[in-house]
Amino acid sequence: MITIKEKRKTRIGEEFIFSLKAPISFSNAIRRIMISEVPTFAIEDVYIYENSSSMDDEILAHRLGLIPIKGKPLLENEVITFTLEKEGPCTVYSSDLKSENGEVAFKNIPIVKLGKGQRIQIECEAIPGIGKVHAKWQPCNAVYKQIADDEVEFFVETFGQMEAEEILEEAVKILKNKAESFLQQLEMIEQ
């Protein structure tokens, strides 16, 4: 049984506190899946057509990859394309990333400062992935503490890609699918 205790917006997402009456092993499985197996979007492929800034292409691509992208992937091969074209002097922010099929979770993340005459022109693609592959796909941090026998209190902090309840629901679905798959494999062994 899940009891929601608190939910509040923060500057980087949400804080979500709930208690769960379940064995510790089950609670830990949910926590691990929330962090490492719930799919989210992150910028993976960056095409730099022009970069006369003082930042190396590789660092610029890395910074773009760490910007949280809103949305829950519906298809495995779904792609969100962003473009960025800016000329200095200015600071380039995540809000400068333009897309017809997606959006960044936070508009105020600085990417690079451009001096007079400096320019960047970039196209990048956000694809679905999981935190087990790279931390840029982690939708949250999750910890818990035991408050009674077979009862824990979770503290979940999201990064803006998805709502906390949505992350929890996805984690439960993933765990259910894993359990069903395991049972099917056991049945095949018994035959």
From Swiss-Prot:
It comes from the Archaea. DNA-dependent RNA polymerase (RNAP) catalyzes the transcription of DNA into RNA using the four ribonucleoside triphosphates as substrates. Part of the RNA polymerase complex. Interacts with Rpo12. Forms an Rpo3-Rpo10-Rpo11-Rpo12 complex upon coexpression. Keywords: Cytoplasm, DNA-directed RNA polymerase, Nucleotidyltransferase, Transcription, Transferase. Transmembrane segments: none annotated. Pfam families: RNA_pol_A_bac (PF01000), RNA_pol_L (PF01193). GO terms for biological process: DNA-templated transcription. Belongs to the archaeal Rpo3/eukaryotic RPB3 RNA polymerase subunit family. It is found in: Cytoplasm. This is DNA-directed RNA polymerase subunit Rpo3. It catalyses: RNA(n) + a ribonucleoside 5'-triphosphate = RNA(n+1) + diphosphate. Coiled coil: none annotated. Its EC number is 2.7.7.6. One of its GO terms (molecular function) is protein dimerization activity.
